[in-house]
Amino acid sequence: MNILRLDASMRKTGSYSRILTDKLIEQLTSGKNNEVTIRDLADGIPLIDENWIKANFTDVDERTCEQKVCLVASDILVDELYKAEHIVIGLPIYNFGVPAAFKAWIDQVVRSKLTFRYGDNGPVGLVENKKAYIIIASGGTKLGTEIDFISDYLRHILGFIGITDVTFIDSSGLGRDESQTLAHAHKAIERV
């Protein structure tokens, strides 16, 4: 099984999303022959800019060498996504949203004619037959509440590119009851 692991926490140590992602990866790979690609978003993801936009919307056969170079990082990230059967995302909530590095990753992989296309009835996701696990960690923002702006966004953007089998592992609200929240998350991981 090929697994793509995305770590979105900017904290390299002491991060609950990273700790729980370690546990989930261990659960998924136990006793199996697996390849895990680790993409640590804290190491940096290029932001898209005007040159990237121009290159992306230029037909592949018409791209200049500079435009091809501009898209190299994006092409690598898209390739990692396509190779994976499972995508495991460790995601903290920062200021009621996803970390900037995760949004940068989304911008790099959501590409017309590559990960989605427009059909007669609207957009069609091209990244099919994938399973996504998303570990959400937060101090106070609880999933499923009126201030949860993340879960619907993630379901939508992943579904937009074709990833519709999404499981959330909830470790939100750690600031309220850390031990109970972590126990819940560990049980959810064991059920995977």
UniProtKB/Swiss-Prot annotation:
Its cofactor is FMN. GO terms for molecular function: electron transfer activity; FMN binding; oxidoreductase activity, acting on NAD(P)H as acceptor; oxidoreductase activity, acting on NAD(P)H, quinone or similar compound as acceptor. Keywords: Flavoprotein, FMN, NAD, Oxidoreductase. HAMAP family: Azoreductase_type1. It comes from Colwellia psychrerythraea (strain 34H / ATCC BAA-681) (Vibrio psychroerythus). The keyword Hydrolase does not apply. Gene3D superfamilies: 3.40.50.360. FMN binds at S9, S15, Y16, S17. InterPro entries: Flavodoxin_fold, Flavoprotein-like_sf, FMN-dep_NADH:Q_OxRdtase_AzoR1, NADH:quinone_OxRdtase_FMN_depd. It catalyses: 2 a quinone + NADH + H(+) = 2 a 1,4-benzosemiquinone + NAD(+); N,N-dimethyl-1,4-phenylenediamine + anthranilate + 2 NAD(+) = 2-(4-dimethylaminophenyl)diazenylbenzoate + 2 NADH + 2 H(+). The keyword Oxidoreductase applies. Binds 1 FMN per subunit. Quinone reductase that provides resistance to thiol-specific stress caused by electrophilic quinones. The lineage of its organism: Bacteria, Pseudomonadati, Pseudomonadota, Gammaproteobacteria, Alteromonadales. Its EC number is 1.6.5.-, 1.7.1.17. It comes from the Bacteria. This is FMN-dependent NADH:quinone oxidoreductase 1. Signal peptide: none annotated. Belongs to the azoreductase type 1 family. Homodimer.
